[in-house]
Amino acid sequence: MKSGIHPTYVTTTVTCTCGSTFTTRSTAASGQIHADVCSACHPFYTGKQKILDTGGRVARFEARYGKRTPAN
C-alpha cells in the first residue's frame, strides 16, 4: 500500500441512544460514534417488528365495492 494516502484506522466506541455500546474500528478521528439504532434496540433484531395488515385493506375494498362474481 502507498503510504500517506490512507486514513488512520483507530479503535472506536459506538454508543446507541438506547445506552448500548460496542467497540469496533473506524476512520472516525474522534474515536466516538453515536448511533440512533443498533441491533439491541432495532425492531427487526428484537422481534418486535410490526407487520402491516394488508388483509384488512382487501376486506375494506371488498366491502366498499363488493366481491367480484365470475361471469359464466
Curated annotation (Swiss-Prot):
GO terms, biological process: translation
KW rRNA-binding (keyword) present: yes
Keywords from the named record: Metal-binding, Ribonucleoprotein, Ribosomal protein, RNA-binding, rRNA-binding, Zinc
Binding site for Zn(2+): C16, C18, C38, C41
The UniProt record lists the keyword Acyltransferase: no
GO CC, alphabetical: ribonucleoprotein complex; ribosome
Note accompanying the cofactor annotation: Binds 1 zinc ion per subunit.
Names of required cofactors: Zn(2+)
InterPro entries: Ribosomal_bL28/bL31-like_sf (IPR034704), Ribosomal_bL31 (IPR002150), Ribosomal_bL31_A (IPR027491), Ribosomal_bL31_sf (IPR042105)
UniProt GO molecular function: metal ion binding; rRNA binding; structural constituent of ribosome
Entries under Pfam families matching the protein: Ribosomal_L31
Domain of life: Bacteria
Function, in words: Binds the 23S rRNA.
Family matches, as PANTHER family: 50S RIBOSOMAL PROTEIN L31, CHLOROPLASTIC, LARGE RIBOSOMAL SUBUNIT PROTEIN BL31C
Family the UniProt entry places it in: Belongs to the bacterial ribosomal protein bL31 family. Type A subfamily.
Assembly description: Part of the 50S ribosomal subunit.
Protein name: Large ribosomal subunit protein bL31
Gene responsible for this protein: rpmE
